[in-house]
Amino acid sequence: MRVLVLVASLGLRGSVVKDDTTVVIGKDNMVTMDIKMKELCILKLLNHILQPTMYDDIREVAREWVIEENMDKYLKTDVVKKFIDTFKMGMLPRGEVFVHTNELHLEQAVKVFKIMYSAKDFDVFIRTACWLRERINGGMFVYALTACVFHRTDCRGITLPAPYEIYPYVFVDSHIINKAFMMKMTKAARDPVMLDYYGIKVTDKNLVVIDWRKGVRRTLTEHDRISYFTEDIDLNTYMYYLHMSYPFWMTDDMYTVNKERRGEIMGTYTQLLARLRLERLSHEMCDIKSIMWNEPLKTGYWPKIRLHTGDEMPVRSNNKIIVTKENVKVKRMLDDVERMLRDGILTGKIERRDGTIINLKKAEDVEHLARLLLGGMGLVGDDAKFMHMMHLMKRLLSYNVYNFDKYTYVPTALDLYSTCLRDPVFWRLMKRVTDTFFLFKKMLPKYTREDFDFPGVKIEKFTTDKLTTFIDEYDMDITNAMFLDDVEMKKKRSDMTMVARMARLNHHPFKVTVDVTSDKTVDCVVRIFIGPKYDCLGRLMSVNDKRMDMIEMDTFLYKLETGKNTIVRNSLEMHGVIEQRPWTRRILNNMIGTVGTISKTVDVESWWYKRHRLPHRMLLPLGRRGGMPMQMFVIVTPVKTNLLLPNLDMNIMKERKTCAGASVSTRCRSGFPFDRKIDMTHFFTRNMKFTDVMIFRKDLSLSNTIKDVDMSDMMMKKDDLTYLDSDMLVRWSYKAVMMMSKDDMMRM
């Protein structure tokens, strides 16, 4: 059924590809172009990025546009001159892997971003993008163009293709890519038994579906038990988009990033770590430890990623010695920076090289601390080269120092924001960084009863539906990983659509109901959390024990009426989550009708919100078959409007939905009330409530008991290929691995 749905969704595929050529870039001035036309231009620029463009209009604009002759059409001519000088000296060659944490690569990418960002209008922006599309490295172009679409005001409303559709290589295992190339080279003409063993299905519509689970597993550590979570394509997209929203190199006020609550990116890090702990708890695994530089790194990692150059992402073996004579200088610098930051937190200030003081005393100074830890401080002189603590940590863990800042650098999983969450050591790095962050929080005064209380408001009841998770399937379009031949380039489409069928965590929709009584009509902020009840050893956890494990599921504004109020929230509408990102091909189907007309409607209110959020299916951890005991917490607090930080622009906060209710409530401290140590004598008030819940995992064994499954031709699969569904049933053809025909001669 899934394949039939895919075929139906691709039924208009030919007409879509045909009609997208009716939008001719460069034919007319594009300043007044509507948002969907702009979006189609961006989609064309990002299609099959590893090859020269297949579109004649892009190629024509790239040929005719001369940057030196149009210097007056850019806001900053010095930016243009610097790029031209760099381009003439030589840039990262086309075909090489772009690494956005490599200083040489990044320096060039920032110059590419600046020249596109400084274009005076959308017409100049697109013409510059076309010129760059045909001349610079494809990965560098995608990175700079994505940053521009995120931050240019005339790009608001544009929906970008998911990064795993633009460059699938770093989101799927190498065996998927290998099988896709095999199918393309043979035009899907393979032995049916081999196709069945590989988990490949081919339809008459040239749709090739490759099952991710049929690949051989490489298991190094117990961390691989939760790889379904850490290697989730949407989770890694979230991390990549978080970086694109707040790039550490983007320090100039002209980009407006310093007008947001940028420092609370640290709150996102703490929430990711808490989410990991809940996932580990589902498998009865204890918390990870902060990385220690003087101890062997016991946890190795096998990325299973092959890049488009044919290079494999390096494998890190277990028990690796971190500090060697080659990287000892990096270790010393890291120690100095970390000591300086911790001393600054304890003393309340850090002195910069030019003599200015960075204060680290008040709650709002978290903005400064986060920039010091993760980059983006805008430091002067040599300060910026060593203040980025996370960058130094990653550099220390690289496989050697000889390839730094080289064009031919082969990245590790840590080097890319789109893959770093896959590596278990990155979570330990985050743990060490957040330890410094928590030291700052520890120095702040504890919340008082007045901070928690809401006089006249009482929560009477707090309930939720049954919480059930399961592992479902998702079909990911990996066609852009394939190279097109001359015939396909002329047709402007691939003859075959390649799809990777992946297993992913999901849960049934649920509702949360809160009954609140109020003695007055008043606006309020409702926060809903979920966290553990017991630790990994089965011990009951106190509020302070688990406060850093509490996940903020939802935060929203609500108007309480006098008397009883019943608040109902659906899991699909909770703040901070989005629905599944649609296929780009389906976006095109929605944009372009059968007559080639393009819809001009766009929900501008949700453009940023839909771009940078977690999928709703990851709200809950996996849980356990018999149920995993958890606790949910709700607190209703008044709206306060006197806490606006001086460097925030509330219009930007509202537009990007940085936190719920930002238009009227400036109290959006990440993690409140669990972000500081709690004085239990002042904590419990009438406007908050805990409730016990259970998270049940439904797997194949439960599904088989309620479905009519013919098991006469099936066998139980018990081997290293199956680690998610331990009781997966497969057809007998799985045993016929060595057969070269469909004749079943191995039967008894």
Curated annotation (Swiss-Prot):
InterPro entries: Di-copper_centre_dom_sf (IPR008922), Hemocyanin/hexamerin (IPR013788), Hemocyanin/hexamerin_mid_dom (IPR000896), Hemocyanin_C (IPR005203), Hemocyanin_C_sf (IPR037020), Hemocyanin_N (IPR005204), Hemocyanin_N_sf (IPR036697), Ig_E-set (IPR014756). Keywords: Signal, Storage protein. Disulfide bonds: none annotated. The keyword Transcription does not apply. Induction: Suppressed by juvenile hormone. PANTHER family: FAT-BODY PROTEIN 1-RELATED, LARVAL STORAGE PROTEIN/PHENOLOXIDASE. Belongs to the hemocyanin family. This is Basic juvenile hormone-suppressible protein 1. The lineage of its organism: Eukaryota, Metazoa, Ecdysozoa, Arthropoda, Hexapoda. The gene is BJSP-1.
